[in-house]
Amino acid sequence: MPTVISASVAPRTAAEPRSPGPVPHPAQSKATEAGGGNPSGIYSAIISRNFPIIGVKEKTFEQLHKKCLEKKVLYVDPEFPPDETSLFYSQKFPIQFVWKRPPEICENPRFIIDGANRTDICQGELGDCWFLAAIACLTLNQHLLFRVIPHDQSFIENYAGIFHFQFWRYGEWVDVVIDDCLPTYNNQLVFTKSNHRNEFWSALLEKAYAKLHGSYEALKGGNTTEAMEDFTGGVAEFFEIRDAPSDMYKIMKKAIERGSLMGCSIDDGTNMTYGTSPSGLNMGELIARMVRNMDNSLLQDSDLDPRGSDERPTRTIIPVQYETRMACGLVRGHAYSVTGLDEVPFKGEKVKLVRLRNPWGQVEWNGSWSDRWKDWSFVDKDEKARLQHQVTEDGEFWMSYEDFIYHFTKLEICNLTADALQSDKLQTWTVSVNEGRWVRGCSAGGCRNFPDTFWTNPQYRLKLLEEDDDPDDSEVICSFLVALMQKNRRKDRKLGASLFTIGFAIYEVPKEMHGNKQHLQKDFFLYNASKARSKTYINMREVSQRFRLPPSEYVIVPSTYEPHQEGEFILRVFSEKRNLSEEVENTISVDRPVKKKKTKPIIFVSDRANSNKELGVDQESEEGKGKTSPDKQKQSPQPQPGSSDQESEEQQQFRNIFKQIAGDDMEICADELKKVLNTVVNKHKDLKTHGFTLESCRSMIALMDTDGSGKLNLQEFHHLWNKIKAWQKIFKHYDTDQSGTINSYEMRNAVNDAGFHLNNQLYDIITMRYADKHMNIDFDSFICCFVRLEGMFRAFHAFDKDGDGIIKLNVLEWLQLTMYA
């Protein structure tokens, strides 16, 4: 069962079958990353219809750069302008930062000087040490570095004030274009800077990353692997160092050798994120402290050269320290980069060393193997040169592996290709990526603590087809890694979003259900225990874990800890051997019973593209008389649903009410239909409904009208009422508390019981369209949904002449179907 690992981790989820007992609420992280929830956007298939209103095709970097050169102007980014809106969103500040381009800050600006390396990064006054620690790791891999930071950029050749950087975003690489205006105070960069006063690649990279997330403030507080994954597209793994395996040093060394990025930290007892301020310190206080820090520095304002010279060193200031500095020089709640591992002969034995870097560019470890440690004199000169030992305050230092595991609590490794760390051989894993969404009221079912809704979460079938090739392992086992990542939570902070507490469970699919892609129902999860699951539900962007299971078919159920939390995610599965991972999607269909003999079809107005095709939904024998024209109706009696001696009391009641309201033409309009339906429905006190609205009745007429008259005759009305009666029984079945509403999570089963089989996206759409703010669906909305489903299925089948599931409509037909519905 999942376990609690810190204050920011949810407690263990509900017990598996046969293990009783409730579980407490998950505790929330005290980090300032937290905020309120925010719903995600609607599916792109729906929102695309508004692209002509909101969509403007973005120009590429090359197009914008060329345009600026032709017009001889410097680029100004309209999406991330050089003003306070790009800085902070939580409040407005009286302090005025001055946005300057590098040529306005110094005389000889350079993008990169002598290659981009980890000493070029010095943290500014923003709590993004986690991001800068990842940059330091990135500089160790030139191939990755050049992909993130295109090097064909300059302040000299073809300079136009425009730069671009590339990041991995949820399965694809995106190019982020920015201008080079940077926030300054007293002609000093406020945020990230380089050791060289005239080098700006790190400051511009930070700006591009801030644009990606909406503001600089959005970067305050995070996990190093979040940025590592955005730099590489890799997958992260977390290790609690106190529970580290015996070969942890070997794991770290192999990770360094194959180019994986690593970061580490010391828990402060409250936060799972680094660079966050303590409780009670808001952004205003942070900025005030920052300004005092700058104003009280050794370099006074009056001494500042407004432009500066290239030879002057960067004015480095230790950031506002809301992390906790320890006597040994290390900092709690702060992210470090792991930049190297080595072994050195020392006094007759080999000592394991770890090299770390503080993104501040200073404040270093002062214990054994630190820069100024006296026993360096016992190390051979060549060994010191090989280890690049220097007594400089650059934030980088060596320490023994024993001291490392004693002081540090967490290690984060970003694997570029998900190679097996436990193996002596590097192996390339296969990967599958699935995008998904939790929709409140439909597919946001929460963890298995909530059995009534857990089954509604998105489900993904995983087929492990081949066992591992491990000669030392006699078990028939498949190794794989599952990584669940929630999307856009940091970007939406200014809208009140925060990271959800997320996790997943893995169930084995019974053999008799192999190949069946149907969504597993509630009873399956009530009587089957999971085969594997994430250790914890935790409020981090990504939760990942390795597993070893026999070849078989499984279902992965990703979820938030609490139900009703709406958001988007991606689920990645890495395996050593071939695997198939895909979302469980029901086939879209409607039950079509065998057509009854001696029954003439009712041809509806939406069916006229195929007027000789019979109605493909449930048909009653009394519907077979057809409909005469309005003129003939006045001259001849209306066909009866059945002989009078066979009519039930209810049918006679309908006939009498219908005659009273319809008038001589024996047809009713929407207002009259409302009166008829509500007169009958009000007699059913157990429904507890306020009746049907006028708009609902208009939809019913539009979808049941056979000749486009805008009215219903008795036969059409009777067909409608037979449907309503059948659907009413379904509604009562799921209205267990007799409140007159059903829970939107039950709508999936209700729709299925009515003979409509939909996929997950359509269930989501039904919830968004028909559920109220409490995620309940009343009788009126319930019937309207079913009427529309029947009408749209019927229309589709009428146009699908060859039965291949594809139709082609011209604009007139499309508008007829959508406007008269």
Curated annotation (Swiss-Prot):
Ca(2+) 2 binds at D705, D707, S709, K711, E716. One of its GO terms (molecular function) is cysteine-type peptidase activity. Residues 649-683, 692-725, 722-757, 787-821 form the EF-hand domain. Residues 587-649 are annotated as: Linker. It holds the Pfam family Calpain_III. Coiled coil: none annotated. Residues 74-417 form the Calpain catalytic domain. Residues 635-645 have a biased composition (Low complexity). Activated by micromolar concentrations of calcium and inhibited by calpastatin. It is linked to Muscular dystrophy, limb-girdle, autosomal recessive 1: An autosomal recessive degenerative myopathy characterized by progressive symmetrical atrophy and weakness of the proximal limb muscles and elevated serum creatine kinase. The symptoms usually begin during the first two decades of life, and the disease gradually worsens, often resulting in loss of walking ability 10 or 20 years after onset. Muscular dystrophy, limb-girdle, autosomal dominant 4: A form of autosomal dominant limb-girdle muscular dystrophy, a myopathy characterized by proximal and/or distal muscle weakness and atrophy. The age at onset is variable and can range from the first to the sixth decade, although later onset is less common. LGMDD4 is characterized by onset of proximal muscle weakness in young adulthood, gait difficulties, increased serum creatine kinase, myalgia, and back pain. Some patients may have upper limb involvement. Disease severity and expressivity are highly variable. Belongs to the peptidase C2 family. This is Calpain-3. It comes from Homo sapiens.
